[in-house]
């Protein structure tokens, strides 16, 4: 079984024998279903074709984005503070190099998701950093959240 990722928006879905028939994020009025239909990949396949690039915007604020660009080109922001680091939004690709670099900067204390287009692989990110909480705003809580460490969306999860 594979946890399929929508190639249009980057959202990961729970493991299944075959790719989902549709993507609820792409069917939302704020997104679109590609003219050619939904496309799907897996995290394992992404790791063979993509890598994460880092850009320091200012001290304590680092942008992380996948290259070549994937889905709608999301980027996450790593906010580094003396009280712990927070990842603002997620990107689909999480790999060993990214986990190693973030751990070298002090690890992660929490993840905050601002919009459904950043659900991506939030469960994978949480698990990679010890099951840290994922905070969703009330407006981002509806819809598919993919394979996550908790059973429901719309509130902080551990």
What are these regions (language model features)?
Residues 2, 19, 57, 72, ...:
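Residue-level preference for short coil/turn positions at secondary-structure junctions
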Residues 12-15, 29-33, 71, 95-96, ...:
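Active-site environment of divalent metal-dependent phosphoester hydrolases
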Residues 12-13, 76, 100-102:
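Short, flexible, glycine/charge-rich loop motifs used to bind or transfer phosphoryl groups or to couple energy/partner
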Residues 50-98:
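Conserved beta-strand hairpin/beta-sheet module of binuclear metal-dependent hydrolase folds
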